[in-house]
Amino acid sequence: SMGSFNTFRLLSDFTGPMSKDKKLLYRLNLGYQNTDGFRDLQFNKNIVVAPSFSFIPNEKTRLNLDVVYQDNKGRLDRGQAVFGDGDLYSTPITTSLSAENDYLNEQNLNVTLSFQHKFNEHISFNSSYMNSGYDEDLLEHRTANNFLALGDGSYDITKVAMRVFNRKRSWNNQNFTNYLNVDFNLGAIENKLLVGYDYFQQELEPGGSQLEANAYLLKNGKATNSFSVAKKDNYVLDENGNPVANVAPFDLTSTNGNAMRDMSNYVYGIRNYDRYKQTGNGIYLQNQFQYKKFNLLVGLRYDDFTDYLNYETAEEEKISQDKFIPRIGMVYKLKPNVNFYGTWVKGYQPQTATTINNPEAGGPFDPLTSELFEAGIKTEWF
């Protein structure tokens, strides 16, 4: 298919048996998309390859292997800059701060192995394991969050101060999920019991790092993103007493602002991403009771999270957080088209230890918690 912004999309889907007895099946999805956008220099080129295989030895058992590979190429879009803090329409909505030689290359690979077995009409078991990898290769010219500083402390609102990020990172994620469904009756009460366990692991691989070229040159051979008149003597100044830019500013009045940038003379600093690992274990129990017109769902989940700081070093430290999370839901069917309902749910999201223990980030931070109470009537008349 073809569409706006030079969009070209090609999709294909192949499926069928791989054996005469049709116990071994396959499916292959292929996708390609190349599209521009209404924003200057923005584009997306995406390739997806997703094969799936299923082995069905009998009507009660199924084993699946699913693979999804995705290659994505584009540029980061950091938004539209305007003159000063005035009219939002002072620059075209197409304006982006990207340079022609910027890029964002991403690769994702997800592999999932899943198993389902039905013991009988009332008991079934499901298990799945997923391993996913993500690689990021980024080069971007982006705003330094201000306009170009002048020597007297004012700003040139026609020029945006710029900085450069050149970053490479790789992540690996693993998930393991198991749950058992049991349907049974206790007298006149129907029960749907769910018991499960899941595990996840997220890890930042070795080598994660970023080169940063900040906005203004310093006399000590480094660069910074801000200019201080009080510390003016620390900066490299031009003949007019203005700070010399390390990364040339983006000129909002020029038609060549998105041209290629010569980065060979930039002064870079380096930021290393320490190896990091987070794991989580979850155990949950849930039952849905049904008695005539009344339905009640009661569930309880226990989550345990562990962060590994300074991972695989002599200073490795474990930070653990855990929580019980309840949930209750109720429905009373007054009439076929009228239902009364009520819900009580709690939520919990820990803040990763790389943030909560970092005083430069303002931490430590408490976990995010939530609690929902809701009651009402749902009805359909037409």
Give the ranges of each region predicted by the language model.
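Structural signature of Gram-negative outer-membrane beta-barrels, strongest in the C-terminal barrel
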Residues: N58, W171, E190-Q202, N272-F382
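Outer-membrane beta-barrel translocator/receptor signature
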Residues: S1-V49, P57-T61
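Acidic/polar loop-and-plug regions of large Gram-negative outer-membrane beta-barrel proteins
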Residues: Q33, S54-K118, H122, N131-W171, ...
